[in-house]
Amino acid sequence: MTIEFFAIQLIGFLGTTLFFLSYQCRSNKTLFRVQFLSYLCYTVHLLLLGATTGGISYILNTVRSFCLSSEKHFLKSRWACGIICALQLVTLMLTWDGWWSILPVTANIAATIGGYTFSARKIRLTGMLINSPLWILYDIAVGSYAGILDEMVSEASMLISIIRFGWKNLTCDENL
């Protein structure tokens, strides 16, 4: 393992830290903003690893977080959700590199739909049951140790947030 490999993993670990902190934000708006920064780190990390589908897919996650934290009505609309999901499918077609390419795209479509419900419960459930498990498999396939840790930490963070805020208190965030 080279210094370059460790540097690439370090960029991913910064994304992991930011993503963990995102679920400790009570406001969905703040959660999406912190995730925006995390996704930027992961985009660079995955592209440097040569994981093109995951890297491009994370660019779309960055766009999604920007849209969901925006004040613009259209960016938080079902149309925007549909456009982002369609772009994920285009990414899959253009970057196909084997069956594992399906994993991040499916995960991110689920997370996009979950995010656009604006329900803290659905956001966390989608993350715990669909998004993280699929990303763990992809990260194993492409050699992203930071990604594997990120998803494990994300699972823990989502569970901690449910315990911390209480399931009943995780409802739609009216401040969006």
What are these regions (language model features)?
Residues 1-176:
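Alpha-helical membrane-protein topology signature
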